[in-house]
Amino acid sequence: MSGLCQDRVVVVTGAGRGIGRAHALAFAAEGAPVVVNDVDGDAAAGVVTEVEDLGGKAVADTSDVADWTGARELIGTALENFGRLDVLVNNAGFLRDRMLVNLGEDEWDAVVRVHLKGHFAPLRHAAEHWRAEAKAGRVPQARVINTSSGAGLLGSVGQGNYSAAKAGIAGLTVVAAAELARYGVTVNAIAPAARTRMTEAVFASMARPDSGFDAMAPENVSPLVVWLGSAESGHVTGRVFEVEGGKVALAQGWRHGPAVYKGERWNPAELGAVVRDLLERAPEPEPVYGAN
C-alpha cells in the first residue's frame, strides 16, 4: 500500500533531532525519500539510519542553510541523489533568549540569521528550480512548509530576536505563497508547540509525563506537516497553522480593523479622540506570551 507521500522527495532542515527528526521519520513512513539536513553530521547520519531501518530512503546533508552557497548545495543534494524535489520543510533554528535590554547584537544576528535567512535561502533556491521546471512544461506539485511560532504570531517576553525572526517567517510565507502559485508551489507555515532541546531546559511544563498522552512530544506536530507536503494539500496555501499535542488550529493573522475616514489630512490634535474611538471598537489583542 502506497503512503501519502510515496516517492515525493522531501528536504527537512534541522532534522537531526527534535521536531525535524520527527518530520523526517514521518515522511519516510509515508513513502518519501528524505534529505536529512543538520549541521551536526552525526545526528543527521543517525536519522538516516533510522529511516533506512524503517525500509525508507534517506541521505544526510550538513549544509549551513543560512549560507547562500550551502542552501543551494542542499537543494542540489536532493536533485543529485533522488532526481527531483517535491517538498521543502524549513525547520532549522535555535534560541538565544534575553530580555531586550540585555540582548546583544551577536545574539540578535545569530537568531535572525538561522531562522529567517535560514528559511529564505533554501526557499529561494528551491523556487528557482521549480520555476525552471514549470517553464519547461513540467509544472510541479511542490510544497513548502515553514516553521513560525506562537512567539512570532503573538510575541514572547525574553525572546525579542526569536519573535521577530518567526514573525518574519510568517510574512515570508504569505508573500512566497502569492508569488509561487503560478509555478505549482504552495507555501504554508506551522507554529508548533513541542518539546525540543530548545525548550525543555526552559519550560518545565513541556517535560514528558509519567503516563498518558504526551502532548508535548515532537511527533505530534509531524502528521500535519506530512499532509501539507502531500499532493492532497494543493488547495491550501498562504496559511499558518498552530499545532500542539492533539490540537490543530488556523492562525487568523493580522486583519484590517476599525477605521475612521476624514477625507483630508488629520491635525495631530484631533487624533487622540480618534485613536480612543478605534481602541474602543476593536477587540483586545491576545496577550504576549510571558507578559504580566
Please name every model-derived segment.
Residues 149:
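Residue(s) in the substrate-gating loop at a strand-loop-helix junction
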Residues 123, 165, 173:
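Active-site helix of classical SDR
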Residues 99-100, 104-112:
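Substrate-binding pocket helix/loop in short-chain dehydrogenase/reductase
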Residues 5-6, 54-57, 77-88, 96, ...:
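A glycine-rich helix->loop->beta "capping" turn
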Residues 41-42, 62-75, 105:
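The beta1-alpha1 cofactor-binding region of Rossmann-like NAD(H)/NADP(H)-dependent oxidoreductases
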Residues 2-35:
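Canonical Rossmann dinucleotide-binding motif of NAD(H)/NADP(H)-dependent dehydrogenases/reductases
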Residues 189, 210-292:
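C-terminal helical subdomain
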